[in-house]
Amino acid sequence: VPNLQGPRYISPASNGGFVVSEECGDVKVFTSGHKLLCSLGSKYGHQFGNPAGVCVDVDGSILVADEQRRTVHLFPEHGAPVCLVSAGLRRPAGMACSSFGQLFVADAGENCVKVFKYRARPP
C-alpha cells in the first residue's frame, strides 16, 4: 500500500482490511482489497497529535493511542469518538484489546503495560 506518511502501527480490521497509524498525522482504514476506506481524522473531525498504537475490537470499533496527547480514543463505526483514557499515560505506544473488554497499552514513558477495562457488556 503506497502513499502513507510515516506508517507506524497496524492492526487487522473486522472487515478483512486493516488500520494503520501515520506518524504525526492520521489513522487510515483500508478495505480487504487494500483500498482506502477512510481516514479517521476526516471522518470524525478528530485532530491527532501523534497517533501510535491501533487495534480493532470485537464490535469493529477502532482504538487509537495518541503518543503526544497521552490519550486513547475509541472510534465506533457509528457515533462520535469517545476518550477512553485521558490520564495516567506518559507515552502510549502499542495496544491490543481482548474480546473480554480489556485494553492493553504499552506505555513507553513508564516502561510498562497498563490494563484498562473499557467495555461493560460481556462478549
Language model features: what each stretch is:
Residues V1-G17, C24, G45-S61, G88-F100:
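Beta-rich, blade/repeat-based domains predominating
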Residues V20-C24, I62-E67, V105-G109:
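Conserved beta-strand positions in repeat-built beta-propeller and related beta-rich domains
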Residues R91-P123:
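Blade-level signature of beta-propeller repeat domains, shared across WD40, Kelch, NHL, RCC1
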